[in-house]
Amino acid sequence: MKRNGLRTVVVLALTIFLLNAPVCATASRLQDTCAEARDEVALRPEWMRILHDTLPICKISIPGSHDSGSIKGGHMLKTQATDIPAQLRQGIRAFDIRLEKKGNKLGVFHSHAFQDIYWEDDVLPAFIHFLQTYPSETLIVSLKKEGGELRDYASLLSVSLSSPEYQSYFVMDFRPELTLKDCRGKILFLHRDHAMDNYPGAACVGWEDDSTCLLTLR
């Protein structure tokens, strides 16, 4: 991942529309259990297919969801009406994933509330499966340590992001001139914590809440 290079400050100009609503999902897996909510939103699983390959990623308005996996915790913590697979089919392409060590895995959390889904078992496989089915699409995935020790988060995240079976689905090096063609069928990660060296995507270390992410390339 390029964190040093050009002496340029690049504002990541991805316009992300954050969608908030009550949630539905099962207690253990990301399954579709809320038919009414799904029916209310038109399915757009391949909307990026009609966009030109030469479009810079930073020039595309990309719909996203805030605390994308937040399915529990009461009215103060729930943020979504549909689970992540349903969001993917509805056209969401930017995801805000908050993780914390839970046992020997990374659980999805919103504040203190565990969402009964795991990064390794549920979320990342859902992303990969979607891209296998719809290779015209690209996903922007923000990863943040929601709690716990940084070393635990870093160790577990490194294992999943270093898995050989997933490497072809990751944008390995961020650069300002990335085009849609560069990213089709792949995930562009935005890392909000310096968890490890040489991880895929872009470093947004120091990205505070309610602020803009600035990527500094020297």
Predicted feature residues:
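Active-site beta-loop-alpha junctions enriched in small/polar residues
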Residues: 65, 100, 144-146, 192-194
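Long, acidic (Asp/Glu-rich), low-complexity accessory segments flanking structured domains
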Residues: 26-90, 101-133, 138, 197, ...
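Bacterial N-terminal signal peptides that target proteins for export
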Residues: 2-10
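Bacterial N-terminal signal peptides
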Residues: 11-20
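Acidic, His- and aromatic-enriched active-site or binding-groove loops in soluble protein domains
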Residues: 161-176, 180
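Hydrophobic faces of well-ordered beta-strands that scaffold small-molecule active sites
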Residues: 60, 95-97, 139-141, 189
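C-terminal active-site rim and adjoining tail of enzyme catalytic domains
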Residues: 190-218
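Loop/turn elements at helix/coil->beta-strand transitions in domains of secreted/extracellular proteins
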Residues: 90-93, 134-140, 166, 184-186
